[in-house]
């Protein structure tokens, strides 16, 4: 037979349930940020999921009653998560670009190195002063071509140095013609970086694309000018943003809007 509990212990009410039983207002509890789970997983999907959960928490009707310390902590975590998402997406995009243009860069680097050897050999054999001046220019062009194939910015679309041209009977003229053809504007930037110092070329290679730089500049300017709008921004499952006005639409208006929009785009902040 089990031992019966005394009536005093049965009648005791837990303090957390006392307000509910007596009819008082229920006290809301806010869960602490689950940083350990995100850090342990480390995947982009986990970071996006955590960011969406924070956005939903901050955009709920009762978010104004949230303690200031909890809200500040969530907003700080949200900023850190956005930075991690942008960094991981940029890293993924970088790897894609490197793999995409790896072979063409490799072959053009080898070709430029062969042209350097060829022009140096021609320069050693040349006796005409005008020819020597022209060959020195060709040698400089070939040396810049080598660095062009190596240090062309990873995040930008690679432009070939030696596109397919008509074959000539004179192989020497064909090789020199490759060095005297028109060059891409980035070629001039690489030439200037070679004169600036050893750190200039790696910086040019790892620079952000013009599109990404413009996007980050706009987002920073928006966060500085309207910080309250950035914290209240909502992200849906596909990464799209919607402000508070769209979140307050009636179900009928939302259904009409979905019918007009049709299929949503798969591109977004959290994809």
Swiss-Prot record:
Residues 1-44, 196-271 are annotated as: Disordered. Disulfide bonds: none annotated. It comes from the Eukaryota. Residues 257-271 have a biased composition (Acidic residues). It holds the Pfam family Efg1. One of its GO terms (cellular component) is nucleolus. Involved in rRNA processing. This is rRNA-processing protein EFG1. The lineage of its organism: Eukaryota, Fungi, Dikarya, Ascomycota, Pezizomycotina. The gene is EFG1.
């Amino acid at each position: 037979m089990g031992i019966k509990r005394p009536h005093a212990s049965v009648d005791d009410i837990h303090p957390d349930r006392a307000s509910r039983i007596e009819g008082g207002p229920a006290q809301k509890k806010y869960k602490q940020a689950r940083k350990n789970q995100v850090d342990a997983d480390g995947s982009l999907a986990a970071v996006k999921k955590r960011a969406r959960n924070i956005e939903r928490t901050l955009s709920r009707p009762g978010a104004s009653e949230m303690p200031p310390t909890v809200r500040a902590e969530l907003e700080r975590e949200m900023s850190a998560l956005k930075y991690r998402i942008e960094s991981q997406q940029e890293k993924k995009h970088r790897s894609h670009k490197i793999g995409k243009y790896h072979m063409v860069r490799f072959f053009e680097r080898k070709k430029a190195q062969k042209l350097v050897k060829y022009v140096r050999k021609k320069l050693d054999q040349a006796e005409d002063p005008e020819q020597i001046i022209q060959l020195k220019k060709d040698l400089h062009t070939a040396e810049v071509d080598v660095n062009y194939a190596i240090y062309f910015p990873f995040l930008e679309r690679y432009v070939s140095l030696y596109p397919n041209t008509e074959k000539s009977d004179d192989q020497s003229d064909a090789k020199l013609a490759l060095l005297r053809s028109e060059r891409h504007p980035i070629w001039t930037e690489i030439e200037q970086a070679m004169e600036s110092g050893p750190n200039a070329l790696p910086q040019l290679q790892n620079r952000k694309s013009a599109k990404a730089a413009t996007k980050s500049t706009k987002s920073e300017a928006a966060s500085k000018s309207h910080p309250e709008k950035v914290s209240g921004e909502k992200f849906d499952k596909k990464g799209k943003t919607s402000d508070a006005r769209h979140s307050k639409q009636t179900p009928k208006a939302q259904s009409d809007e979905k019918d007009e929009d049709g299929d949503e785009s798969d591109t977004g902040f959290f994809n």
